[in-house]
Design a protein with these regions (language model features):
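Periplasmic/extracellular loop-to-transmembrane helix junction in inner-membrane transport proteins
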Residues: 2-8, 26-62, 74-78, 225-231
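Interhelical loop and adjacent transmembrane-helix boundary motif
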Residues: 2-6, 37, 44, 205-251, ...
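C-terminal transmembrane helix and the adjacent membrane-cytosol boundary/short C-terminal tail
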Residues: 3-11, 16, 24-27, 150-165, ...
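Cytoplasmic-entry segments and transmembrane alpha-helices of multi-pass inner-membrane transporters
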Residues: 7, 11, 74-105, 161, ...
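Transmembrane alpha-helices
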Residues: 11-18, 92, 139-141, 145-157, ...
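Membrane-interfacial helix termini and adjacent extracytoplasmic/periplasmic loops
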Residues: 35-38, 47, 102-138, 209-211
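Transmembrane-helix boundary motif in ABC transporter permease subunits
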Residues: 38-40, 59-90, 103, 107, ...
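Hydrophobic alpha-helical transmembrane segments of multipass integral membrane proteins
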Residues: 51, 55-67, 71, 97, ...
Length: 274
């Protein structure tokens, strides 16, 4: 194949791929006048869903960071029997359909679930509450963060860890003053990607928490609900969600460029595993 033919073929393939990815997003904004977009800030459905999304996503994300960071550090620093199986288990939610995740959460924490009687005895009801939303979001986003955090901690030079221990630093000091700062770039990228995934969660949430406005209805659920009632409102909320996602991605790119001179957060996150 000649060089010109190859260049033409790759250009056509790239053009088709780019058009396929861009066209649906452009179509949303072509259907939504700016006035309708701004009007959504006065829409009670949108405001309630935004509050629920931000509240539950932030709580879930903080929990993922608090529990996921030490877990990732342990897995990255230690070599033990079953380590590979444990990592595979952590990654398993990545390949599960969201509906399966929701049913699994119901089977574990629902009223008739594995822990249902114990929770009921304590007067705790999780299913179809904001707590259920938080658990659903944490379940689907945690593999994104933990897997990226493991790679980030693995990228830290073991000699620096050993040197800190030789100088008398205890495990807490080594973790907080050496490992965390050196892995901060990758941890930040993994955190942002996990947060974005959590904000977009739909399937597990609607099955485990339902879609009650002002209580468990997040932005993705509000879009789905409005789709059956007012397509224009669903389009406007979708456009706002695209803008939120774009803002997160741009922030990632700026952060990655500032830290590593790369505009790709995915390349940046991958570089931490080397």
């Amino acid at each position: 194949m000649s060089r010109i033919a190859f260049a033409a073929m790759t250009a056509v393939a790239a053009g088709v791929a780019f058009a396929f990815l861009l066209l649906p997003l452009v179509a949303i904004f072509l259907r939504v006048p700016l006035g309708d977009l701004l009007d959504q800030f006065g829409n009670q459905v949108f405001r309630d869903a935004l509050v629920v999304s931000l509240k539950t996503s932030l709580i879930a994300h903080v929990a993922v960071l608090l529990f996921g960071t030490p877990t990732a550090y342990l897995i990255a620093r230690k070599r033990f029997f079953g380590r590979g199986a444990l990592i595979t288990l952590i990654e398993l939610p990545l390949v599960l359909p969201p509906a399966v995740a929701g049913i699994a959460l119901l089977a574990a924490f629902g009223r008739l679930g594995l822990l249902g009687d114990e929770l009921d005895a304590l007067g705790i009801s999780i299913g179809f509450t904001q707590t259920a939303v938080i658990l659903a979001v944490a379940f689907v986003e945690s593999p994104f963060y933990v897997r990226g955090a493991i790679a980030s901690f693995e990228s830290v030079d073991p000699d620096l860890i050993a040197a800190a221990r030789t100088l008398g630093a205890g495990p807490w000091r080594v973790f907080g003053r050496v490992a965390l700062p050196l892995a901060a770039g990758g941890l930040g990228a993994a955190s942002a990607l996990a947060l974005a995934r959590g904000l977009g969660e739909f399937g597990a949430t609607i099955i485990f928490a339902g879609s009650l406005q002002g209580v468990t209805q997040t932005l993705p659920l509000a879009i789905y609900a409005q789709l059956e009632q007012d397509f224009d409102v669903a389009l406007a909320i979708s456009a706002l969600f695209v803008l939120v996602g774009a803002a997160i991605l741009v922030s990632l790119k700026v952060f990655a460029w500032a830290r590593h001179g790369s505009i790709s957060p995915f390349r940046f996150a991958a570089s931490t595993s080397r």
